[in-house]
Regions:
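Conserved nucleotide-sugar phosphate-binding/catalytic loop shared by glycosyltransferases and other
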Residues: 2-14, 28-81, 306, 452-471
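A short, glycine/small-residue-rich beta-strand->loop->alpha-helix junction that serves as a flexible
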Residues: 9-21, 46, 202-203, 416-427
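Short N-terminal targeting/anchoring amphipathic segment
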Residues: 79-97, 488-503
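A nucleotide-sugar donor-handling region in carbohydrate enzymes
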Residues: 121-124, 131-192, 197-199, 390-398
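Donor-nucleotide binding loops and adjacent catalytic segments primarily
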Residues: 178-257
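Acidic donor-binding loop of glycosyltransferase active sites
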Residues: 253-266, 275
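Catalytic binding pocket for nucleotide-activated donors in carbohydrate/polymer assembly enzymes
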Residues: 266-315
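C-terminal amphipathic helix plus adjacent low-complexity
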Residues: 315, 321-404, 521
């Protein structure tokens, strides 16, 4: 008898946090339990590399997505199709805001879980929390800095099932130091500092400062994760550039210290695997990275500054370069080291995915009653809170939609790329003779990093033989045609179409047909 099927849905965060937590849980589920992923994150290729079926759907802020209203309608239809085809026993959402298309479609799933991390900014909007009761259960991944949590979720822990901090790997999965050094191309046995501050304009200067300071130090090797130096024009010669290293924690035995941002993943991996670090918090709308960094420094497990512009970075790097200082931090880390909550979360989720035993209305794990999706009822207070959020944001929403309608670029050219590599896709993009933001790419490939970085909007159709196509049943050509119809729904007519790989002529004709005729051809 086949085991339960669980669909993990993640939002488009600023890093890999949402996806990594979901994969950490999925890889510890019973082997009879099937995991599927739907994500709005461009890190979808990582999910595939880890062996999980994944379907990427572009987020509302992506090029060619159109207005929020058009995106929401299109996303609702796509999610509904994915859920109907997969027929999961349980849906797990990891993100800050459960978006409307998800809420509209997850009613079809027997049980739903919001994986909702804590440590929100004290002033963060509480509007997302008014949607908590629309889920059957809340899972809260623990935070090492939980005692410093002054955000809005800190008073709502009684509604959540909390587990220890979730990290991707277990101790036994880390490479021994010699093996890690060899795979990364590092000089064996030399003290090594890792720099992984992420990317973006706010961190470029801080990254450059860190690399310059560390590269001048005698007897120390400096390694920078790929994202940390992307966009930098001047990388010191002594810095080792690390590429394709996910999960980075697999190589942590090679490092004696680190300079790191303080997102959930990086922070808890450093703490869990006892890496003395200088934490540089980034400003985020919800995640209180500053609180994490300050707490870690206050209990002696790390060094911290206030942010990427902090003038004390060089001084703190001097402390990090001190072997005795690192040794003291490592001892403290070993003393306070938290458990990995991924396995406990997996067992809890598996229990939710199984229907209650006959005669019971609840599971033994203490979650709310589970219905068939149609029986969920929100409390009057929660419905009133959501209604108030809706009413008070009407003027802002109308203004935003009007601005989007007037200013957002509309795609004029579509590239259909099936069975094509990225070189062929780039060639088609160059032949388009249109600004990249006016080109919509529809492809069965996720190896399109350069295309994404060029600013081209992309949508994904699972390839032949992939699990999503199998679950849909029937002929693959029909599956692909339906997916293309959902992707193009509500979009204006496209003037031209280019192809890469093997694309049937009827798809090209349908893609460039007037919207009404296009809908009939692709339905």
């Amino acid at each position: 008898m086949a085991g339960p099927r669980i669909m993990f849905v993640s939002s488009n965060g600023t890093g890999l946090g949402h996806l990594t937590r979901s994969m950490a849980i999925a890889r510890r589920l019973d082997r009879d339990t099937e995991s599927l992923f739907v994500t709005l994150s461009r890190a979808a290729p990582v999910v595939r590399e880890m062996g999980f079926p994944v379907e990427y759907m572009a987020s509302h802020g992506s090029p060619t997505a159109g207005s929020d209203l058009r995106w929401s309608r299109r996303m609702t239809a796509r999610l509904r199709a994915a859920i109907l085809e997969a027929d999961p026993n349980l849906l797990v959402f990891d993100g800050i805001l459960p978006y409307d298309p998800l809420l509209a479609t997850m009613k079809r799933v027997p049980a739903t879980v919001w994986c909702r991390r804590g440590l929100w900014q004290p002033g963060a909007s509480t509007a997302p929390l008014t949607r908590s009761d629309l889920f059957d259960a809340i899972l809260e991944p623990g935070d090492f800095a939980a005692s410093a949590d002054a955000g809005p979720t800190s008073s709502r822990r009684d509604e959540a099932h909390e587990v220890p901090p979730i990290v991707f790997l277990d101790d036994a999965e880390l490479l021994p130091r010699a093996d890690a050094e060899r795979e990364l191309g590092l000089e064996p046995g030399k003290p090594t500092i890792l720099v992984q501050l992420g990317q973006g304009p706010e961190v470029a200067d801080a990254t450059a400062r860190c690399l310059r300071t560390l590269a001048r130090a005698d007897g120390v090797q400096v390694a920078a994760a790929s994202s940390a130096i992307s966009g930098l024009l001047d990388v010191p010669e002594r810095v080792v550039h690390l590429r394709s290293t996910y999960p980075m924690s697999r190589y942590y035995a090679a490092f004696d210290g680190a300079v790191s941002a303080v997102g959930y993943n990086a922070f808890h991996e450093m703490v869990r695997f006892a890496i003395p670090a200088l934490f540089v918090p980034m400003r985020r709308e919800t995640d209180d990275q500053g609180a994490r960094a300050r707490y870690a420094a206050s209990v002696g497990v790390a060094l911290a500054v206030d942010g990427p512009q902090d003038e004390r970075i060089e001084d703190r790097l001097g402390e990090l370069l001190d072997a005795d200082r690192r040794g003291a931090m490592r001892e403290r880390l070993e003393e306070l080291r938290p458990d990995n909550g991924a396995r406990e979360a997996a067992r809890w989720i598996e229990a939710l995915a199984e229907p209650p035993r006959e005669g019971l209305t609840t599971h033994s794990v203490g979650n709310p009653p589970l219905g068939d999706g149609t029986q969920r009822r929100s409390s009057l207070r929660a419905r009133a809170a959501r209604a108030w959020v809706f009413v008070r944001t009407i003027p802002r929403t109308i203004t935003r939609l009007m601005n989007q309608t007037l200013t957002l670029p509309r795609p004029t050219t579509i590239i259909l790329a099936f069975g094509a590599d990225e070189a062929a896709i780039r060639d088609a993009l160059n032949r388009a003779q249109e600004p990249f933001e006016r080109v919509l790419l529809v492809t069965d490939s996720l190896a399109i990093g350069e295309v994404w970085r060029a600013g081209t909007g992309a949508e994904h159709v699972p390839a032949p033989g992939e699990r999503e196509a199998e679950l849909a049943g029937g002929d693959y050509a029909e599956f692909r045609r339906r997916r293309l119809g959902l992707i193009l729904a509500g979009r204006p007519r496209l003037r031209s179409a280019l192809t890469a790989g093997e694309v049937p002529p009827d798809l090209v004709d349908a893609a460039t047909a007037p919207p009404r005729r296009r809908g009939r051809l692709l339905s």
